[in-house]
Every structure is written in C-alpha cells, then in structure tokens.
Amino acid sequence: MTLPLVEARSLSKSFGEGELASQVLKRLSFDINAGERVALVGPSGSGKSTLLAVLGTLLGATSGDLRILGQPMIGLPEAELARFRNRNLGFVFQFHHLLPDFTALENVLFPAAAGKGRETRLMRERARALLVRVGLEDRVDYGARKLSGGQKQRVALARALINRPALVLADEPTGNLDSGPAEQVMNLLGEINAEDGTTFLISTHDAAVAARCTRRMELLDGRLVGQDPAD
C-alpha cells in the first residue's frame, strides 16, 4: 500500500501563550496523495496561509503529527528541516518574492545553488529549460524589475520547480494577477501536475481556480469543515 505524500493527524497551531494564546489551526487531520492537485479554500483568516506554512516546515505545529514522504516533521532540528524543505518542497506565493537585482535565470537558480552551496552547469541548464517551459525563453537574462506581474509569477513557478520537489505549496498564486496572466499560471500548474506528477496544494479565494483542482479542502475558523476524499 502506497503511503500518502502528506499525513496530518490532529494538527494544531497556536500563537502566544496562556490567556493570550490564539489557536489558529484546530486538530486538522487529512491526507494528500502523490500527484494530486488540491484546492485549499476558506475565507480570509480561516488559517489557510498558516496551514501552508506548517506543511512547508516554515512554522512548527503546536501539537499533533505531520509526516511528509513518510518522514516525521514534528521536532526535527531546524537544520534538518531546512535540508528537507530545500530538497522536497517548492513554494509559490501571491507576491512573487523575486530578488529584484537578479535576472530571471538567477532567481530560478537560487534554491538549487543554495542547497548545494554552489552553482553547476546542470543547474543552469535545468533553470533555463524551466524558463522555456513556462514561456519565458526570451526573458531568461532580463532583470526581475523589467518583468510584468504575470512574468514574475511564472519565474516564481520555475523557481519552485528547480529542485524537482514532490510537493509545491502555492499561496494565492493568482491572487495578484489579472485574468489573462492568472489563466496562464493555472494552465502551467495543470500541465506540470499532469505531465510530471508534481503534487500541488493551492490556497485560493477564487472559485475558478478551485474548480481547476482535482479536489478541495475547506477551512473555517481553523477547522477543516469539508474535504473531498483523497484519490
């Protein structure tokens, strides 16, 4: 039997202590299987971004159990979490977070070079190939400041894929884009999911984006109030 890519059991996250503590995630239990494209929906303040940060090992859970690729995440030292994150997880945010003084190619290369401590020819070839794949073959050496919003988000997607992650966590990836560029980004996510088997968890307020996913999970006030069954 194949294990789920992500296994969360009674996962909770609180901020603050004592009477000032605020519980943002409340005993969430779910699985995400390899190759799925899952929409994470819910109103603002429901805990979507916090859940993505916990799944991405950027925030530690307060209680519960989290396993990714079968490996327990809770309690791992930060150095181990950083290595795991770099090798196995990709991130796309609503605001692209590109390094403004770097070219498109240099931005895509950054996670790979950071993980290895150096840049290699094979890394550059893969980064260039990813930029071609997302339709930016004529923008490879453009500075990030010169790119449009949609182009920046496609660079961010290529950057998320540079280390061949098993899971990409996308937090409102089309939320800052007009309809045309947003459609381009969602088409690319769908193609990469179908062709490469990369798993995506996509936080969104957009019903059209959620409809492009294979299933959905709904958060309300930090609780999982609905989810389609895992494939």
Curated annotation (Swiss-Prot):
> Keyword DNA-binding, does the record have it?
no
Q: Which residues bind ATP?
A: 42-49
Enzyme class comes to translocase
Q: Pfam families of this UniProt entry?
A: ABC_tran
User: What protein name applies here?
Assistant: Lipoprotein-releasing system ATP-binding protein LolD 2
Which keywords are on file for this protein? ATP-binding, Cell inner membrane, Cell membrane, Membrane, Nucleotide-binding, Translocase, Transport
Q: What does this protein do?
A: Part of the ABC transporter complex LolCDE involved in the translocation of mature outer membrane-directed lipoproteins, from the inner membrane to the periplasmic chaperone, LolA. Responsible for the formation of the LolA-lipoprotein complex in an ATP-dependent manner.
Q: Where in the cell is it found?
A: Cell inner membrane
The membrane-topology field of this record reads: Peripheral membrane protein
| Gene of this entry | lolD2
Please give the InterPro entries that the UniProt record associates with this protein.
AAA+_ATPase, ABC_transporter-like_ATP-bd, ABC_transporter-like_CS, ABC_transpr_LolD-like, MacB-like_ATP-bd, P-loop_NTPase
User: Which molecular-function annotations from GO does this UniProt entry contain?
Assistant: ATP binding; ATP hydrolysis activity; transmembrane transporter activity
Lineage of origin: Bacteria, Pseudomonadati, Pseudomonadota, Alphaproteobacteria, Rhodospirillales
Q: What is its main location?
A: membrane
Q: How does it assemble?
A: The complex is composed of two ATP-binding proteins (LolD) and two transmembrane proteins (LolC and LolE).
